Amino acid sequence: LTAIGQSSAQYALRDPDIRLMLRVRADEAGAFEQLVLLFQQRLVVIMKPMVGSREEAEDLAQEAFLRVYKSRKNYHPKAKFSTWLFTIANNLALNSLRSKKRRPQVSFPTTESGQQQQVGIDQRLPEKQSQPEIRLHNVELADVITKALDGLNERQRMAVVLNKYEDMNYADIAVVMGLTSKAVKSLLSRARVNLREVLKKYIYMDGQSSEKYES
């Protein structure tokens, strides 16, 4: 094996997504379609808070996959596949914002049916509440969190999305955003402070600590 071949094989042993991408690189039938099915919704969820529109996020996700396909023959894994893909997505989202020179509006991730996800908020509510009360509480809290996220700058917002929705660590977020791990830690720290200021009044009124929503 060549040095590049050995490197690819080593990464592939650790990351099934890389193995799938290597199948795409080899033009294996059905591999690219499988890759799209695996990551399309995740890309939309990541980019929607950045660009403010599900339709635009879907368009950018398609563009990201197009770039992946066009560059497949030059693909040589140097990190997790998801990190490489999300780097492409982040750059596309930032380029879209720069070209439009507008402030994005943040909305909650949605399911395939278009309904807003509540990211487990209902599990955190007291059991004694009735279902109508829980639904009203969820809607109110989702609106508060959406507005809080909208108050973050672009970098803070992306760092929060990658950290919370994709469960990415500082090092991987740093690769995606072109920053150092220390800078990512600082971004998330400032984002938590900003979120705490917006959320604390609502959450403290419920007698709950805001930490569970920020950590």
Each predicted region: which residue ranges?
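DNA-recognition helix of helix-turn-helix
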Residues: 94, 156, 162-165, 170-201
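C-terminal edge and immediately downstream basic/flexible tail or linker adjoining helix-turn-helix-like DNA-binding
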Residues: 1-9, 13, 105-111, 119, ...
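Short, charged helix-capping/linker segments at alpha-helix termini
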Residues: 4-5, 10, 25-34, 44-63, ...
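Structural recognition of an alpha-helix C-terminal capping motif at a helix-to-coil junction
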Residues: 59-66, 79-91
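Amphipathic alpha-helical segment used for protein-protein interaction
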Residues: 26-29, 101, 122, 126-158, ...
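Short helix-capping/turn signature of helix-turn-helix
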Residues: 38-41, 49-52, 142, 161-168
